[in-house]
């Protein structure tokens, strides 16, 4: 995930993102990609405890040096919270939210710069099974509504089943890379359009 998310450079091989060889980019270019093109969601929610859900969601625009005025920043943050069903919790602090709600705030924060790719590292690792389903359904809705490519790293087979493509890694090596035919069949049975190739979860 660190290589895919441009947090690390590969020590060998090549990684092309939108036609660019990531290993040839400098730190400023990599930082721009991380801030503008990729959103991150982690197992730990990484929310600031003394700030509201709304303020936590605004952070990418503040840290990214955006010149968006405060009113527009707030409007976008509210929209992101609404997209994950938390508009009514905007003024709540993390300790006033359940684990699932905190993860939804983290997802909303990851959406603030309208990324083309969302990287989710064990996003359900700290959640119970019911809440895990809710989070994965949010990812599915975002994929359908926004066309975002979502990459989910998980040890849970039932979570992986939400993906349209499943890569299995063992001991640092990809041992399988297959389309999720069961999920595609379910979509066709519901008369839904299949997810485009190359997207996950």
Segments predicted by a language model, with ranges:
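ABC family nucleotide-binding domain
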Residues: 1-163, 168-169
């Amino acid at each position: 995930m660190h290589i895919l998310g441009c947090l690390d450079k590969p020590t060998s091989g090549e990684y092309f993102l939108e036609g660019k060889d990531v290993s040839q980019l400098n730190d400023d270019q990599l930082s721009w990609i991380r801030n503008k093109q990729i959103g991150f969601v982690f197992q730990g929610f990484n929310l600031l405890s003394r700030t509201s859900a709304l303020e936590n969601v605004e952070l990418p625009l503040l840290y990214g040096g955006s010149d968006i005025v405060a009113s527009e920043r707030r409007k976008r943050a509210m929209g992101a919270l609404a997209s994950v069903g938390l508009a009514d919790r905007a003024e709540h602090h993390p300790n006033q939210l359940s684990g699932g709600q905190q993860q939804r705030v983290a997802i909303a924060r990851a959406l603030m710069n309208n990324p083309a790719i969302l990287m989710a590292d064990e996003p359900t690792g700290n959640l119970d099974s019911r809440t895990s389903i809710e989070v994965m359904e949010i990812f599915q809705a975002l994929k359908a509504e926004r066309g975002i490519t979502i990459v989910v790293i998980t040890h849970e087979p039932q979570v992986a089943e939400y993906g349209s493509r499943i890569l299995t890694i063992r001991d640092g090596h990809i041992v399988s890379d297959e389309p999720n035919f069961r999920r595609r069949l379910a979509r066709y049975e519901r008369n839904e359009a299949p997810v485009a190739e190359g997207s996950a979860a």
